[in-house]
Amino acid sequence: RIGRLVLRAAIDKGASVVAVNDPFIDVNYMVYLFKFDSTHGRFKGTVVAEGGFLVVNGQKITVFSERDPANINWASAGAEYVVESTGVFTTIEKASTHLKGGAKKVVISAPSADAPMFVCGVNLDAYKPDMKVVSNASCTTNCLAPLAKVINDNFEIVEGLMTTVHATTATQKTVDGPSGKLWRDGRGAAQNIIPAATGAAKAVGKVIPALNGKLTGMAFRVPTPNVSVVDLTVRLGKGASYDEIKAKVQEAANGPLKGILGYTDEEVVSTDFLSDTHSSVFDAKAGISLNDKFVKLISWYDNE
């Protein structure tokens, strides 16, 4: 699913996509799944299967069907940059197998235990050209980190707790079923609010070293199809009114983080952010302040 949405986004941005890999479905099924999307709507361009190719807006895309990334001949299709979005090959060792087929760089669309992790607007300046495998972190980290950066840069985060109220994802169960060691994760997604673990807050410490060990968090999985929201509650080192905090966030949203961190003071709800391309949209009306050093901040994100 993430791969299909990456393809939509790439087409919107004018990127040249030359190949895709999916070992589980044929090209005709790919056409169907790409054309129709229950959450984001029908694809506005054209998509057909032709001679074994996936043809999107007239552009032929080579289709591979390999379970082992090492067997994908990316070079034959002219692919240089690969988005690894299976959620399976998330370490440097596993993701590097794409390089055997001729890829030059691999971007993992998930957190990684050992690959360098980057969040747009936060730590891209640390990227080095010799890095061949990198992680773009999680959707929640991409929402949390830009906001945490603005707050820490201006007011110093002493410590904080994060909760993400998170839409249903593909790994959840439609009805109650077994789920390994995480028993609650196996409960029916449409019937329950499910407390769950997330490493998103701790991951912020990897992209903002000054916050390492200062943030942790959890998730509540809720029965909505898309769009999630971060609740960041922090103790500040430098006292500030809520209005002062809002002003700094808005300044960043209109300046260095434009297009990454958004700002709204309207009466919004989750569906208002469906297909929103910002990593994070600060909700000025939803946050609250107990005093000038203890504040709860709210930010929305389309988690897909």
Swiss-Prot record:
Signal sequence coordinates: none
Binding positions (NAD(+)): 1-2, 22, 67, 303
Main location: cytoplasm
Gene Ontology biological process: glucose metabolic process; glycolytic process
Active site: 139
Record's catalysed reaction(s): D-glyceraldehyde 3-phosphate + phosphate + NAD(+) = (2R)-3-phospho-glyceroyl phosphate + NADH + H(+)
Family annotation (Gene3D superfamilies): Dihydrodipicolinate Reductase, domain 2, NAD(P)-binding Rossmann-like Domain
Spans traversing the lipid bilayer: none
Pathway noted in the entry: Carbohydrate degradation; glycolysis; pyruvate from D-glyceraldehyde 3-phosphate: step 1/5
Residues given in the record as D-glyceraldehyde 3-phosphate binding sites: 138-140, 169, 198-199, 221
Compartments in which it is found: Cytoplasm
Pfam families, per database record: Gp_dh_C, Gp_dh_N
Keywords (A to Z) from UniProt: Cytoplasm, Glycolysis, NAD, Oxidoreductase
Presence of keyword DNA repair: no
SMART domains tied to this protein: Gp_dh_N
Enzyme Commission (EC) number: 1.2.1.12
CDD domains registered for this protein in UniProt: GAPDH_I_C, GAPDH_I_N
Subunit structure: Homotetramer.
Family: Belongs to the glyceraldehyde-3-phosphate dehydrogenase family.
Stated name of the protein: Glyceraldehyde-3-phosphate dehydrogenase 2
Source organism per UniProt: Drosophila subobscura
